[in-house]
Design a protein with these regions (language model features):
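N-terminal flexible segment immediately upstream of the FAD-binding catalytic core
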Residues: 1-40, 45-99, 116-146, 175, ...
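Alpha-helix capping/hinge segments and adjacent helical runs
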Residues: 24, 498-510, 535, 539-543
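C-terminal substrate-recognition/cap domain of FAD-linked oxidoreductases
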Residues: 28-35, 46-53, 57-68, 267-268, ...
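FAD-binding subdomain of flavoenzyme oxidoreductases
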Residues: 137-294, 543, 559
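Activity-critical C-terminal alpha-helical subdomain
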Residues: 216, 514-560
Length: 560
């Protein structure tokens, strides 16, 4: 249905209601014209109304700047036209806002830290932006049960810091942790770097408080029990729903004990087959301590080293190191970053010894201590010597020697998205595939650009969460966006994923970018069922419209 026919255009009356409901200081808008003039002193018991200087002394100027920022995603790829952003401080205020919007057919776009990559947190048209950033309190941390209850606007890194002070940690780690909010993480079912150890948010979230489209506050879902086998687990409907069924306002989540020691190891491999074999060995022999397994290709490392200050290639070629020149001439193509942890500091030395033994068994050559780091050295071996030493699936490795060094090594993977911000126009795809097929998509994409003579202007990078089959495919074009570039990528990337029974969205969600691609992974009956659920929770469709449910003539209300 046409957006303008279905939803009301925001009026002065609507803005005045929002001001009365949550206070002028919590409303940013460009609907009501504000003029610079002296603010009148409010009389006792006088009802609050919108006056020109309630937010600033320059009319709507500051609000315009704020709204411009909130109407765009961080990639500056998706843009909305909202003229009003609301900043409630309590669930009750969220309830007032949604009840009014429901009654008046006003579309709403919930927004957290706005770090998403598919346009899910910015308006498609002129929806009112509902920001949760001022609902940012950690309400309780239970030292006995390990359960943390907090509001949706708490920044992930700040929540993790609060837990660390109590000897616990968040079971979720993201590159955007310094800005993303836990409510947005839950609403997108964010995966992150340590899913292999702690599992997804569907398993670690115990309870939610959610405000429905009509203003109903579902506080009864905010349970802290690890076991509850009574009825349907309704909270699961809101995890990953991208704010289309209700607005998450509070979360109860399991906080595991924080590890006391962390060691990062980087391996270098020549083929992706070696990468997969290495991961299998890691899971088989180090499962108890394994907390993350990531991979990135040579193009990703090259971009990071060339772009970000302080980033260094962990394995620079050294002709004077006495290494086998034949091996050095074989370019390393892949890197595997492995994070291992132990809960007791006293166990760190044993873990380090285990890692060294593991590396010796999978990497060509011997190990020696060099310049304070455990570094892989490549002496000459005859073929029969290699056979005696067993199967070798990596070329080099480096083990971190302290926390600072661990962070430096881990940042080689974690900061790739930051480096990509300086690479021009970037086309990002977050997909899940059978592990053995992950990198084939990257290679096929490079071939498609090469046969069209576009491989010089376009770079294709591949990295991701090796432990759960999640590939981040990135195509960058220094000269900016181009229709010809997009035509090479789509729909091929989605066709490939569908052909290999993967998912077009592994962890980023559908947002505005992939909503129509939902048809690729689900049949019509499944999508119709999703639409029925949407209609039940949000019959007027005011919550994050044009997201999650694809448009199709077969999904009109009369056919549901």
């Amino acid at each position: 249905m046409n957006h303008r026919l279905r939803y009301k255009v925001l009026s002065d009356e609507d803005v005045h209601f929002f001001v009365r409901a949550i206070g002028a200081e919590n409303v940013a808008q460009t609907v009501v014209k504000k003029e610079k003039k002296k603010k009148k002193k409010k009389k006792k018991n006088e009802e609050e109304t919108y006056t020109p200087d309630d937010n600033n002394d320059d009319g709507n100027g500051e609000d315009e700047i704020l709204l411009k920022d909130m109407n765009a995603d961080w990639q500056k790829k998706y843009f909305g036209k909202s003229k009003c952003a609301l900043f409630p401080r309590t669930s009750e205020e969220v309830s007032k806002i949604l009840r009014y919007c429901h009654e008046n057919h006003i579309a709403v776009c919930p927004q957290g830290g706005n770090t998403g990559l598919v346009g899910g947190a910015v308006p498609v048209f002129d929806e009112v932006i509902l920001s949760l950033k001022r609902m940012n309190s950690v309400l309780s941390i239970d030292d006995v049960t390990g359960v943390c209850v907090c509001e949706a606007g708490v920044v992930l890194e700040e929540l993790d810091d609060a837990l660390m002070r109590r000897g616990m940690c968040m079971p979720l780690d993201l590159g955007a942790k310094g800005k993303c909010q836990i409510g947005g993480n839950v609403s997108t079912n964010a995966g992150g770097l340590r899913l292999i150890k702690y599992g997804s948010l569907r398993g670690t979230v115990l309870g939610l408080e959610v405000v429905l489209a009509d203003g109903t506050v579902l506080s009864s879902l905010l349970r802290e029990n690890r076991k509850d086998n009574t009825g349907y687990d309704l909270k699961q409907l809101f995890i990953g729903a991208e704010g289309t069924l209700g607005v998450v306002t509070k979360i109860a989540i399991i906080a595991p004990r924080a590890p006391e020691a962390r060691i990062v190891t980087i391996f270098a491999c020549n083929t992706f087959q070696n990468v997969v074999e290495l991961m299998v060995e890691m899971k088989r022999r180090l499962a108890e301590n394994l907390s993350a397994v990531e991979f990135f290709d040579r193009e990703s490392l090259k971009l990071t080293v060339e772009t970000l200050p302080g980033a260094k290639d962990p394995f620079p070629y050294d002709e004077d190191a006495g290494c086998n020149e034949d091996i050095l001439r074989t370019k390393i193509q892949f890197y595997v970053a492995m994070e291992t942890t132990v809960n007791e500091k006293a166990m760190e030395s044993r873990l380090r010894a285990n890692l060294l033994n593991f590396a010796r068994s999978v990497v060509i050559g011997d190990t020696r201590r060099s310049r304070g780091n455990f570094v892989r050295i490549l002496p000459k071996f005859r073929n029969d010597d290699m056979r005696k030493r067993g199967k070798k699936i990596a070329q080099r490795f480096m083990i971190s020697v302290n926390n600072k060094h661990a962070n430096e090594l881990w940042n080689l993977r974690e900061r790739i998205p930051v480096a990509l911000k300086y690479a021009g126009a970037v086309y990002k795809y977050d997909v899940s595939l059978p592990t053995i097929k992950m990198y084939e998509l990257v290679e096929r994409m490079r071939e498609r650009f090469a046969v069209r003579g576009m491989d010089e202007e376009v770079k294709v990078l591949g990295y991701g969460h090796l432990g759960d089959g999640n590939l981040h495919l990135n195509i960058s074009r220094k000269k900016g966006p181009c229709k010809d570039t997009l035509a090479v990528i789509e729909p091929f990337v989605y066709d490939y994923v569908t052909e290999h029974k993967g998912s077009v969205s592994a962890e980023h969600g559908l947002g505005a970018m992939k909503v129509q691609e939902l048809w690729r992974g689900k049949d019509a009956e499944e999508v119709r069922l999703m639409q029925r659920v949407k209609n039940m929770f949000d019959p007027r469709g005011i919550l994050n419209p044009h997201k999650m449910i694809p448009s199709s003539p077969s999904l009109t209300p009369s056919k549901l």
